[in-house]
């Protein structure tokens, strides 16, 4: 049993075979996936909700949960009307997280100061909605300062004063940092999610982190359609391939892939306060 804790299946790359992709996931033991609600910007941040409304609850597909939020790429598009709309979407019964949000200094599609301001606002909205946050953090090639900035903002505006005391917490998705970054995130109460890039030859720092992170603080994901793992690298990614992430982590820790899948599945349901047997959310305080 596996859960893909982060995927984007709403895009055009799946228009011709989306149902088949979901069916393949279920056939490969994927119990559920989290449909990330970023879309092409604030106006389409309900894309995960629309996926859940169309496909969730059908026995041939995985269960589908959703998030809402503004990706740092689209930070320049944020406005008060969008914030209000996302708070409305956050009330949907399938929405369990706010994200992905954070900082991206690699592409810099939005100015960095704008990214920081919107990241702060998104954390405020997540607190209002009482939802955990899903963090996107990508540094530039020649600097790790995105990690320092991102973790500092989490300390100041989320975990220290709000997240740890309220129990909201968060997930560092598609982790690409160092062992030290992972330790700092764990100290802040975050889960660490590993994606297909853990299988890439040059990703030793990610593999080192995966050996250090306690199994009960770990999630796995595909980040589909991106970062297809070896042996599928270069292809369009899909949730069925999350088993390759589990296999790689299992090899690092001398455990069967199935155990990594089972443990991270339980972690997903525990973190979000969901009942595994019924896949219905428990009441939030």
What spans do the regions from the language model cover?
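Mid-domain alpha/beta scaffold segments of enzyme catalytic cores
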Residues: 1-285
């Amino acid at each position: 049993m596996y859960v893909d804790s982060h995927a984007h299946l709403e895009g055009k790359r799946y228009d011709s075979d989306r149902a088949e992709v979901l069916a393949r996931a279920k056939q490969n033991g994927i119990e559920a996936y989290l449909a990330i609600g970023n879309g092409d910007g604030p106006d389409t941040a309900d894309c995960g909700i629309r996926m859940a409304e169309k496909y969730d609850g059908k026995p041939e597909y995985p269960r589908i949960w959703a998030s809402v939020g503004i990706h740092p790429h689209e930070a320049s598009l944020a406005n008060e009307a969008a914030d209000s709309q996302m708070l409305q979407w956050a009330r949907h019964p399938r929405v369990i997280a706010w994200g992905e949000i954070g900082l991206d200094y690699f592409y810099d599609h939005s100015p960095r100061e704008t990214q920081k301001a919107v990241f702060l606002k998104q954390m405020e909205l997540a607190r209002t909605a009482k939802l955990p946050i899903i963090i996107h953090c990508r540094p530039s090639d020649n600097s790790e300062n995105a990690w320092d900035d991102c973790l500092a903002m989490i300390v100041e505006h989320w975990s220290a004063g709000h997240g740890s005391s309220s129990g909201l917490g968060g997930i560092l998705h598609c982790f690409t940092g160092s062992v030290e970054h992972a330790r700092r995130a764990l100290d802040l109460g975050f889960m660490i999610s590993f994606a297909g890039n853990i299988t890439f030859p040059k990703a030793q720092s990610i593999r080192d982190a995966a050996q250090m992170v306690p199994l009960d603080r770990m999630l796995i994901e595909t980040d589909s359609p991106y970062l297809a793992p070896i042996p599928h690298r270069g292809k369009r990614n899909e949730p069925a391939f999350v088993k390759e992430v589990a296999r790689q982590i299992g090899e690092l820790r001398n455990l069967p892939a199935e155990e990594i899948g089972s443990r991270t599945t339980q972690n997903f349901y525990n973190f979000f306060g969901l009942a595994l047997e019924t896949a219905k959310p428990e009441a939030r305080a």
